[in-house]
Design a protein with these regions (language model features):
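Catalytic core of PPM/PP2C metal-dependent serine/threonine phosphatase domains
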Residues: 49-120, 142-144, 194-223
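Regulatory cytosolic signal-relay segments
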Residues: 1-20
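Acidic loop->beta-strand submotif enriched in PP2C/PPM serine/threonine phosphatases
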Residues: 17-31, 126-167
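DG-centered beta-turn motif at the end of beta-strands
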Residues: 40-41, 111, 154-162, 219
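A short alpha->loop->secondary-structure connector
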Residues: 116-126, 172
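Beta-strand-turn-beta hairpins that frame and shape the catalytic cleft
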Residues: 2-5, 29-33, 99-103, 150-152
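Primarily the active-site beta-strand->alpha-helix module of PP2C/PPM metal-dependent phosphatases
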Residues: 22-79, 156, 167-184
Length: 223
């Protein structure tokens, strides 16, 4: 049996009291699967938190009803309110389902892509794309992937507050970037062999905060 270590780290936008990112996870008693959800509400503060909480909670509740996560994601897309000006959803999300047999299913919508490491090296998955339109106006694209987990595999996912950290600051004209985040994680895994989920997430978040010179311009979450 696989031992699964789940944790997260988070920092609010500078001078804000509430985080607009939400991470939830739950073990489904009926089939012993585990569902993890990270949602990033549009903007920051209370409104972003409410929308992200609604999105993550919906994903958890549908999982408890043993719904397929691909179907769950499509239902969420049809439920989420839309920004009337930008024609985009008010929240993004990543859903990960881990079954007792080690099969891991991932659905991603507009979040930075999940980073997977095996033997301390990045593992790149083939992803299928589901495209749809809601009310004949808003288009969306879901990335779907699945693979079999091996012992000591690492799955790291984060909000764009990580990948875009430092944007506009010296050395980060377009932010930290997903590739550099991946390189940083790979370095950590090589340096610290038995790094816990909490410690790994903490290191990523603290580095992202430092990229902003400790005055974060977005909510930051890593799980």
């Amino acid at each position: 049996n696989l031992y699964i270590d789940i944790d997260f780290s988070q920092k609010r936008k500078y001078l804000h009291r509430i985080c607009g990112d939400v991470f939830l996870y739950k073990k489904v008693k009926e089939d012993n699967s585990i569902i993890c959800v990270l949602s990033d509400g549009l903007g920051s503060g209370v409104k972003a938190n409410v929308l992200a909480t609604m999105t993550a909670s919906m994903a958890i509740q549908y999982a408890l009803q043993q719904r397929d996560i691909k179907k769950t994601a499509e239902i969420i897309m049809k439920t989420l309110p839309t920004d009337s000006v930008r024609k985009i959803s008010y929240a993004t999300f990543t859903i990960i389902e881990i079954n007792p047999d080690g099969i891991c299913k991932i659905v991603e919508y507009d979040n930075p892509q999940v980073q997977i490491f095996r033997d301390k090296n990045p593992l790149f998955l083939e992803k299928s794309i589901i495209e749809g339109t809601i009310n004949r106006k808003r288009k969306y694209k879901l990335l779907i992937s699945n693979f079999e987990l091996k012992q000591n595999d690492k799955l790291i996912f984060f909000s764009d507050g990580v990948s875009q950290s430092g944007m506009g600051c010296p050395g980060f004209p377009i932010g930290w970037g997903e590739k550099k985040v991946s390189d940083f994680i790979s370095h950590l895994l090589s340096k610290f062999e038995n790094l816990s989920a909490r410690a790994l997430c903490h290191e990523v978040v603290e580095h992202a905060v430092a990229n902003w010179n400790y005055q974060t311009k977005d909510d930051i979450t890593c799980a």
